[in-house]
A protein has these predicted regions:
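Active-site hotspot residues in diverse enzymes, especially metal/ion-binding acidic/histidine motifs
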Residues: 1-169
Length: 169
């Protein structure tokens, strides 16, 4: 497995945003030629798989709209970053970044695609915390914390909020 740097992941996500012209995960899937299937998954929220050269995302059919978008961005991240590894179904906790580098990379990709930096910066400057920012941006506090962490490392001087990796368990 090739490890991607944070900079490579952010660059890839930004390139897709520019080319697709949208943050909509459905539009991005369409633009990239990824087939999307809603299915009654039991334990997983989403799965990325290549089947006979057909790139597929299987997503749990009863997710709320916010979680659905996050899961789709995450699975699109696997398509863009880990396509070669998508040869078998694997079960991972979406936000378990401590045990699996691929999951961390897909989460970072999702944070970059899903959260506009300018909007996020405006809310940070208003003094909001990661949970209230997530609520206002229809996202998740863990995704906001991850994005703030990457912004802090890149060019901003921010206090990095703590986040739980296992909140979906």
């Amino acid at each position: 497995m090739k490890l991607n740097t944070n900079e490579e992941i952010i660059r890839k996500a930004n390139s897709i945003l520019r080319m697709a012209g949208s943050r909509s995960p459905e539009r991005i899937c369409h633009y990239l030629g990824i087939h999307l299937y809603e299915t009654p998954l039991k334990r997983q929220k989403g799965v990325y798989k290549v089947i006979e050269k057909r790139r597929c995302i299987f997503i749990k059919n009863d997710l709320d709209p916010v979680m659905r978008n996050i899961v789709l961005w995450h699975e699109i991240g696997h398509d863009q970053l880990h396509r070669k590894e998508a040869t078998q179904f694997r079960e991972f906790n979406l936000f378990d970044m401590t045990t699996n580098r691929m999951e961390y990379e897909a989460n970072l990709f999702a944070a970059q695609i899903g959260l506009d930096e300018d909007q996020l910066w405006d809310y940070i400057m208003q003094g909001r915390d990661d949970v209230s920012i997530a609520r206002v941006l229809n996202s998740d506090g863990n995704l906001v914390a991850l994005k703030v962490s990457t912004m802090s490392r890149a060019e901003y001087n921010l206090r990095i909020p703590e986040h739980r990796n296992d909140f979906l368990k």
